[in-house]
A protein has these predicted regions:
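Right-handed parallel beta-helix
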Residues: 82-88, 129-140, 156-169, 178-196
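Glycine-rich beta-solenoid repeat tracts in large extracellular/virion proteins
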Residues: 75-79, 92-105, 120-127, 145-154, ...
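C-terminal motif of bacterial Sec signal peptides marking the signal peptidase cleavage site
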Residues: 7-11
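N-terminal extracellular ligand-recognition/capping segment immediately after the signal peptide
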Residues: 50-53, 57-103, 111-118, 137-138
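Right-handed parallel beta-helix/beta-solenoid
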Residues: 17-48
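Bacterial signal peptide processing site
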Residues: 13-15
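Sec-dependent N-terminal signal peptides
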Residues: 1-5
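Surface-exposed or flexible loop/turn and strand-edge residues in extracellular/cell-surface modules
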Residues: 27, 60, 67, 73, ...
Length: 196
């Protein structure tokens, strides 16, 4: 006798229509905190998240970025097909993250990547297929020329969904992609542009 349990966790408010619910987390997905990533807004999580990607099987998989501010001093590099990077929700908030009064009750909520010193928060390598990035906020940091999400070239069947990009030099850079979907994304406060 065997049993299979699929446990569901959600980070959304419990309204009747689930309008505030962007994503769920199951026990068959990998959580980047299990690899040492810490969403404290201070610790560099680049190596931990890249280790999580390296641990995925050759056919890809799903990695979850839980709620918190995950700082990057180097890009998250996606170098496998069929990889999904999924936040629990993009944590809609204003451009101002207040410091003082105990950080005004802490981070603004949602799953946030902060490209502190990284030239890109997420870089999808040339030739990758089936890469999905969803339910995240991507914010710039101290690197003056950072890119939020960079599809480096000749990618196929990629998808960006429910992404918020803010305070970046370039929000999304896509080179030579085929069958790319961009759905429900909002990019603002950029000195450069949204897409190339």
């Amino acid at each position: 006798m065997s049993a299979f349990c699929l446990c569901m966790f959600t980070a959304c408010d419990s309204d009747d229509n689930n309008l505030l619910c962007y994503g769920t987390h199951t026990d068959i997905e990998g959580d980047v905190t299990a690899f040492g990533a810490v969403g404290d807004g201070k610790t560099d999580c680049s190596k931990a998240i890249n280790s999580a990607i390296a641990s995925l099987p050759a056919e890809g998989g799903v990695l979850v970025i839980p709620e918190g501010d995950f700082v990057l001093d180097a890009p998250i590099v996606i170098n496998k097909h069929n990889v999904t990077i999924k936040g629990l929700n993009p944590g809609m908030r204003s451009n101002i993250d207040v410091n003082g009064i105990n950080d005004l009750l802490g981070p603004g909520g949602g799953s946030k990547l902060v490209a502190r010193n990284a030239e890109a928060a997420i870089k999808v390598e040339t030739g990758m297929k089936g890469v999905k990035i969803m339910n995240l906020m991507v914010s710039g940091g101290t690197e003056a020329k950072n890119i939020g999400i960079h599809f480096a070239g000749a990618t196929d069947n990629g998808m960006l969904s429910n992404i918020i990009g803010i305070n970046l030099h370039t929000g999304v850079k896509i080179e030579q992609a085929k069958n790319m979907q961009i759905v429900n994304c909002w990019v603002c406060e950029l000195p450069n542009r949204c897409r190339k």
